[in-house]
């Protein structure tokens, strides 16, 4: 079969070389090919007695990988030019970062020594920060600790004498160096100076931690408490390591009231404690000082203790040590129903306290009103206060339902829509679970309610709910989220929704508060092959608990997902 000779653009026509050695000379190094030529590229076969040469028009520019010195030095190779023009300060910083990644302190110090003797390099804050960080990383290495501390302070002194103000990262590194040699006072002074200067660089927990932990290790309790007060004034929240250290130093120095305070802080901020913290708690209760602590008579006032527990939301009273005599410490498990298998006491499902709940409710009202004020006045919207008044009048509910979330669950298919049967199933299930046979309250947007009323298959049930105050229609232009969240918070009842309420977390109170509230009040649901399953709140909270009898239960962090396998410290008094 005879091949049809393709037509070539004139710019690409070339003669067949008489020998192979001339092929390189024949093909241009770079050929500009238009997009149309590239799209219509065809294989061309040129033949003579010595060579069969196959050329793609579109690949001719890439056939020669050899480059001349002129090509390498041309502006078309920006990387080499950029590398050649890199300034010495930037080169030093890159090399220091490389030392940090390799954990090579000796190499970093050698670079620093060379830099301070060079007239071409002016050290800046980034250089000093990188060096100080690397020095602080070796304070726990016995072979390099002394060098790291000594050279670290030399570097810091040069930084300050150069007129460079240390930022938070630099102060943190030097504070760690100071604490490593037992100078908690200097570590604390660095933080106080940083706060006094002000500006954009502010201290963090890691900035305070070296001084606080140093004072605790050296049993300088009062200085440790001073650091804590300074942290509190700066809005820094303690975490487990710091609280545990303060508890240890308080126990070691016989400050029983401080020990009680830090147990409460662990309950509030941590929940489950680590093995290390549990050992510190155990040592305190086994000690002589703990057995000498008495309740000063409050243990006999059961009504006072119960009222305090109720006010706090359950799980603690906060009035101080209760009982007399030695403590008995056991490690055991808690049943799925919340019963301690060591002492038979039932643990509480801890709720938010009255003050927190009231603040939460007020915040919801404020935000709902602000949203209303920002909306276009042309849109009809009933005042949120109308719902507040309605709820005050009819607010005898044990559960609130996010109607839209339930009705639209798993309805994202071709014929899917709002499922009233799903909503009805939840209403019936909660009614049957209610000991007092109370109906829940459904909150649903008015537009959705009107659509259901227009459907003859749904009208009777919806009208029945409205007449029995089981259904409240939120007004047009409103966000029904605020309504069901407000109702559940105000009535301190259950909230049935799968909504994670992440938006609310960021807009309302602290994340820790909202998580605690959700754990106690949110009911999640699923429908498996049409069958409803409600996931009720757990019967007890996995946090440190203090009972009205004076006993303590401390959950320990566990890798087991099965809650019944978690270890708990059960701490009771012989007289209780």
UniProtKB/Swiss-Prot annotation:
One of its GO terms (biological process) is mRNA processing. Zn(2+) binds at residues 340, 343, 553, 570. Keywords: Hydrolase, Magnesium, Manganese, Metal-binding, Nuclease, Nucleus, Repeat, tRNA processing, Zinc. Pfam families: PPR_long, PRORP. Mn(2+) 2 binds at residues 481, 499. Its cofactor is Mg(2+); Mn(2+). Residues 65-88 are annotated as: Disordered. InterPro entries: PROP1-like_PPR_dom, PRORP_C, TPR-like_helical_dom_sf. Its EC number is 3.1.26.5. Disruption phenotype: No visible phenotype; due to the redundancy with PRORP2. Prorp2 and prorp3 double mutant is lethal. This is Proteinaceous RNase P 3. It comes from Arabidopsis thaliana (Mouse-ear cress). The gene is PRORP3.
